[in-house]
Amino acid sequence: MKLWGGRFKEEESKLMEDFNSSLSFDKKLYYEDIKGSIAHVKMLTNQNIIKEEEKEKILLGLEEILKEIDEGILKIEGDYEDIHSFVEINLINKIGNVGKKLHTGRSRNDQVALDMKLYAKKSTEEVIECLKELMDSLIKVGNENNYIMPGYTHLQRAQVVTFRYHLLAYFEMFKRDEKRLENALEILNESPLGSGALAGSTYNIDREYTAKLLGFRKPVDNFLDGVSDRDYIIELISKFSIIMMHLSRLSEELILWSSSEFRFIQIGDAYSTGSSIMPQKKNPDGAELIRGKIGRVYGDLISILTVMKSLPLAYNKDMQEDKEPFFDAKDTVISCLKVMEGIISTLKVNKENLMKSVKKGFLNATEAADYLVNKGMAFRDAHKVIGEVVIYCEDKNSAIEDLSLEELKQFSDLFCEDIYEFIDYKNSINKGIKKEMGYF
């Protein structure tokens, strides 16, 4: 069942027919394909290219096909080359020869470019909504657990932060992701419909009308570019990859924090699994799967970049390979965002263990150095003094705040009784611009 064949003497081989067909995956575009056809038919009527009664028959047929697909009456299957062929041939079977006028002034090249842009817009809006839900949960859980905890560099305890502030760092990452996606939406918001195969059409079609009807800002400026452009797919998968990178970083920390070695958090049962042999195990499989799925999205990005490399203008069949990477990347990032939101919104925070870890890591050493600076010592000298204090504490298995004033004075006469108040963890986190961390 093909939309072409008049210039061929021999039938396409079954092997080639199966190899060439994209229906198994581009069937996802049925809604966009039909909506694009509806807009195209309305424009053809407005421009007196087809008659009003022909428009009504075609529109009725398209709406019926859409309804039958949505209700599961019409299955998207069979020996069709693609979703465009499926819709058009079913339309002709339903309403007769008038259905053959649907494709007037249009090519599958601008048709598929339109379908993919419409689908990309819808998909991006879905991802943005998932990002917003995750960001809301990060804020909510952070506000509910504004506890002091260790901050890390090199995975070594470094300085005091709060659990809330740590989560807000991820909020900032996802906020940037949202902005990147919104920017991508603005760039792709041009309609390729009317570009034809590559050189427009001899019909006096109204591209402005269809662009507006389909929710685009404007039609594309160049027909060749309109059917050849897949930059937006590359850009979106790239942005999905950055989202996945952020999710993998958060996943890694959740996995570490939930381990027996940290015990900072407990991941809810709803997002954990067990072991088939070890009865005691509770595994953070949700976070681990998110961490692992980054590879497939990175792979999708490399796939589409490779497809588009060195392609001459205009459309080439290689571009059929743009869909599966995009579909996979979009589905993966949405599922990962939803699972991460579930993990965050249901986790439990162990306040006591957070504080125990704070006290074990000399996390007030920088504040102790700042104390000496405030007393008149140069920072580099203060840095050396406190480094020596830390060595002394390690030998004694003690914390800085547990040393007596006499012990501290062995390292500098500048130490006074007020050192203890200055390096208190809860006090120090509210000094200077540290107040911006919002500990209360």
Curated annotation (Swiss-Prot):
<dbReference type="InterPro" id="IPR000362">
    <property type="entry name" value="Fumarate_lyase_fam"/>
</dbReference>
<keyword id="KW-0456">Lyase</keyword>
<keyword id="KW-0963">Cytoplasm</keyword>
<comment type="similarity">
    <text>Belongs to the lyase 1 family. Argininosuccinate lyase subfamily.</text>
</comment>
<dbReference type="InterPro" id="IPR020557">
    <property type="entry name" value="Fumarate_lyase_CS"/>
</dbReference>
<keyword id="KW-0055">Arginine biosynthesis</keyword>
<dbReference type="GO" id="GO:0042450">
    <property type="term" value="P:arginine biosynthetic process via ornithine"/>
</dbReference>
<dbReference type="InterPro" id="IPR008948">
    <property type="entry name" value="L-Aspartase-like"/>
</dbReference>
<dbReference type="InterPro" id="IPR022761">
    <property type="entry name" value="Fumarate_lyase_N"/>
</dbReference>
<dbReference type="GO" id="GO:0004056">
    <property type="term" value="F:argininosuccinate lyase activity"/>
</dbReference>
<comment type="pathway">
    <text>Amino-acid biosynthesis; L-arginine biosynthesis; L-arginine from L-ornithine and carbamoyl phosphate: step 3/3.</text>
</comment>
<dbReference type="InterPro" id="IPR024083">
    <property type="entry name" value="Fumarase/histidase_N"/>
</dbReference>
<dbReference type="Pfam" id="PF14698">
    <property type="entry name" value="ASL_C2"/>
</dbReference>
<dbReference type="GO" id="GO:0006526">
    <property type="term" value="P:L-arginine biosynthetic process"/>
</dbReference>
<dbReference type="GO" id="GO:0005829">
    <property type="term" value="C:cytosol"/>
</dbReference>
<keyword id="KW-0028">Amino-acid biosynthesis</keyword>
<dbReference type="InterPro" id="IPR029419">
    <property type="entry name" value="Arg_succ_lyase_C"/>
</dbReference>
<dbReference type="InterPro" id="IPR009049">
    <property type="entry name" value="Argininosuccinate_lyase"/>
</dbReference>
<dbReference type="Pfam" id="PF00206">
    <property type="entry name" value="Lyase_1"/>
</dbReference>
<protein>
    <recommendedName>
        <fullName>Argininosuccinate lyase</fullName>
        <ecNumber>4.3.2.1</ecNumber>
    </recommendedName>
</protein>
